[in-house]
């Protein structure tokens, strides 16, 4: 008997929480509705049957009911639509958790507003307490600060409103930070502090630090912002909850340090980790890298959600700070071609040593020169003697001649479509129209060349919102719907390609396509449900779509929809 739930939304959620906890399920769960499998045939089905955390049937409703037998719970989706669980293909897990509790500077349209936010925080903070924030981007401000050096603000205004509290404000790109005088005093950062390799300490005309740190120079501020293991655990759990609300079932954590890894392993051991995590060990830490290279990867089993089987190196910076490494100088700053942040010989060495235990090597490269150098390293190393699935994280700006090399060398292009929506309006200033047209965000060219792609958001550089990422992939517009026809529309992805790029292709990029990524018999029962059908809704309505249910291993970990269901048992019918 199908019973609709009534009452306030909170009452609905409270009651559903009681009824749909794993212990209240029959051993078998049947879910019916519009379901896209994202398998090789782009199949759409009516129902799935889940038992012991895996799909045991995928197909039409009548056959599903027969397969489920007389003792099962039936969850009907109604007007909602289901897909394989969305996989975040590239993000920063603990940084997301921190961003939730720190000053959120995303979307703030002026430096003066940021100064005001810091002033408010300083008024509430205890003396010496570090004020942290993230998300500012000078190219997105409506007006330029009154004082700038190299196009960036200085610490002066922050130091005036927060003289007794160190301030650390991370750039949206994660490659630049702004600190105030109290922070520099705590760090003993002065005019004669040596610039680290692969980093930049921006200084004014007198030689004094302005508070802006680029690339490896950001590490100088690490003592101010380093998390304890307990703090990292808190951040990861906050990020996990946030991810569930956006329909994320799996998360590729791009560059975890020792503290993050320790926290992840502790949460996994305690059972508090529900999100599936694919961890990339930070190759920026030589000691950590050498430790893990000498050991086999950690692969999640039935009682685990954590896999550690890859490394992440960082070859260059970001376009916004003009630290992405280019073959030719920046169009709007001919005095620089960006920054190399990792030694290519060290990268080749890591790649060669990775063969002993089958580690995957993933390397951040945004600029075309950085991408060329990483491809060269893969070509020099012995990786291609095995199924290495090396990834270039971002693969954002490429020489046309390098596109075919991705396919030839078996390299995965790990893109973040949402970066195109956010950055394309001003990226043309950095690169000029010719480089934009020939090599920027060239997803279609990569696919046509036979390159495997993965797709993520780079959260918290961008919000984790997979709906916005889907829209960016298929529309190639800003989130305001501009321009009307989209940017370089020949590079668009289809909706089926986009769905796969967020599910099956991301699973492939983590060697997990046999376990997750599509709704297929035998795979883990991970699903994301949205209130609208992403595959058919008008393009201009995609961004209004909301995730309403997240299922991991057959367990509903997030629910924001009213559902109808029945519980069928032999010789017994119950109303709920």
Give short role names for the model-derived ranges:
Residues 268, 298-302, 407:
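Acidic (Asp/Glu)-rich catalytic clusters
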Residues 234, 352-362, 366-390, 394-395, ...:
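His/Asp/Glu-enriched, well-ordered alpha-helical/loop segment
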Residues 1-14, 565-568, 572-576:
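Single conserved hydrophobic/aromatic residue that forms the stacking wall/gate
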Residues 25-31, 36, 40-294, 309, ...:
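Divalent metal-binding segments
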Residues 90-92, 364, 394, 567, ...:
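Histidine-centered divalent metal-coordination motifs
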Residues 7, 127, 521-524:
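Short, flexible surface segments
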């Amino acid at each position: 008997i199908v019973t609709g739930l009534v009452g306030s939304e909170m009452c609905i959620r409270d009651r559903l929480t009681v009824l749909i906890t794993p212990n209240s399920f029959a051993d078998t769960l049947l879910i019916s509705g519009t379901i896209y499998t994202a398998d090789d045939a782009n199949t759409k089905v009516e129902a799935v049957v889940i038992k012991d955390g895996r799909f045991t049937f995928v197909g039409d409703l009548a056959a599903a009911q027969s397969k489920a037998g007389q003792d099962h719970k039936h969850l009907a989706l109604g007007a909602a639509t289901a897909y394989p669980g969305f996989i975040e293909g590239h993000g920063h897990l603990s940084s997301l958790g921190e961003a939730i509790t720190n000053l959120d500077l995303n979307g703030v349209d002026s430096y003066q507003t940021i100064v005001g936010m810091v002033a408010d925080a300083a008024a509430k903070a205890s003396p010496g307490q570090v004020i942290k924030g993230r998300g500012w981007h000078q190219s997105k401000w409506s007006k330029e600060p009154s004082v700038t050096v190299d196009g960036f603000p200085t610490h002066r205004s922050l130091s005036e409103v927060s003289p007794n509290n160190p301030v650390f404000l991370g750039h949206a790109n994660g490659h630049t930070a702004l600190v105030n005088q109290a922070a520099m005093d705590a760090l003993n950062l002065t005019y004669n502090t040596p610039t680290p390799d692969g980093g930049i300490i921006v200084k004014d005309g007198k030689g004094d630090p302005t508070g802006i740190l680029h690339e490896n120079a950001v590490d100088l501020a690490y003592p101010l912002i380093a998390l304890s293991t307990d703090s990292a655990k808190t951040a990861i759990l906050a990020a996990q909850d946030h991810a569930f609300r956006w329909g994320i079932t799996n998360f590729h954590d791009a560059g975890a340090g020792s503290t993050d890894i320790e926290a992840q392993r502790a949460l996994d051991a305690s059972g508090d980790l529900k999100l599936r995590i694919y961890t990339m060990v930070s190759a920026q830490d030589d000691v950590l890298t050498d430790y893990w290279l000498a050991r086999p990867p950690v692969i999640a089993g039935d009682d685990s959600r954590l896999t550690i089987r890859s490394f992440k190196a960082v070859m260059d910076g970001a376009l916004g700070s003009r630290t992405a490494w280019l073959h030719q100088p920046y169009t709007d700053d001919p005095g620089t071609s960006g920054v190399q942040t990792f030694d290519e010989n060290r990268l080749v060495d890591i790649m060669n040593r990775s063969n002993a235990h089958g580690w995957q090597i993933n390397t951040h490269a945004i600029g075309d020169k950085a991408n060329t150098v990483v491809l060269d390293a893969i070509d020099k190393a012995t990786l291609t003697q095995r199924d290495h699935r090396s990834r270039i994280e971002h693969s954002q700006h490429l020489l046309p001649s390098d596109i075919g090399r991705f396919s030839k060398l078996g390299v995965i292009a790990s893109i973040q479509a949402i970066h195109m929506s956010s950055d394309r309006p001003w990226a043309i200033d950095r690169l000029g129209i010719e480089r934009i047209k020939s090599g920027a965000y060239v997803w279609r060219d990569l696919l046509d060349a036979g390159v495997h792609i993965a797709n993520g958001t780079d959260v918290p550089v961008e919000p984790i919102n997979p709906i916005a990422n889907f829209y960016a992939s298929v529309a190639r517009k800003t989130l305001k719907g501009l321009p009307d026809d989209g940017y370089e529309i020949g590079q668009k992805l289809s909706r089926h390609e986009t769905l796969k790029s967020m599910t099956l292709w991301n699973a492939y990029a983590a060697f997990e396509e046999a376990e997750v990524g599509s709704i297929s018999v035998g795979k883990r029962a991970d699903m994301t449900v949205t209130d609208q059908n992403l595959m058919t809704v008008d393009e201009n309505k995609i961004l209004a779509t909301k995730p309403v249910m997240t299922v991991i291993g057959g367990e509903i970990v997030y629910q924001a929809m009213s559902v109808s269901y029945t519980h069928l048992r032999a010789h017994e019918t119950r109303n709920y």
